[in-house]
Amino acid sequence: MAKVLVLYYSSYGHIETMAQHIVEGAKSVPGVEVTLKRVPETIPVDQARAIGVKVDQAAPVATVDELADYDAIIFGTPTRFGNMAGQMRTFLDQTGGLWMKGALVGKIGSVFASTGTQHGGQETTITSFHTTLLHHGMVIVGVPYACSGLVNMSEITGGTPYGATTLAGADGSRQPSANELDIARYQGKHVAELASKLAS
């Protein structure tokens, strides 16, 4: 049985929502075990609450060592100046021991993201994230254009061939759209299908 981990960091809930739909898509594939976890918050709790960070989230916090237990990992992060959030970076910077052992070599790695604006760095966030995964020897999986949501021209929407994305709005008021959530589910299903094939 293939094991898929959806691992995310979410400040205000947008990536958390996307992650839940990624999980939904992955769980639609028979014979795949799907786990949802998050990386630790690095902002002190009082400060985080003061700036509106969603501190209380249902997903348990992951440990670095457990990454080796999965056949595929789908990472989710908000954008910080075209890169992953510092909380995710801090978590991944602790994976040197896994790298030394080659513990993630041959496993699937996939990424989804959120930005505050339409041109806020969605694609650079995902592609720069890929660098870390490639150093670990992971096999990168995105979202193919077989996903019809990628060519939706009837609305402003996230979604890239590199991975699902959502636009949060500069003030965080915009929630993931139906199209963005469809792409997220597609990504989860696509990764799970490939993980199942690799694990068999």
From Swiss-Prot:
Disulfide bonds: none annotated. It catalyses: a quinone + NADH + H(+) = a quinol + NAD(+); a quinone + NADPH + H(+) = a quinol + NADP(+). One of its GO terms (molecular function) is flavin adenine dinucleotide binding. Belongs to the WrbA family. Gene3D superfamilies: 3.40.50.360. Binds 1 FMN per monomer. This is NAD(P)H dehydrogenase (quinone). Its cofactor is FMN. Signal peptide: none annotated. NAD(+) binds at Y12. Keywords: Flavoprotein, FMN, NAD, NADP, Nucleotide-binding, Oxidoreductase. FMN binds at residues 10-15, 79-81, 114-120, 135. Transmembrane segments: none annotated. Its EC number is 1.6.5.2. Pfam families: FMN_red. Residues 4-191 form the Flavodoxin-like domain.
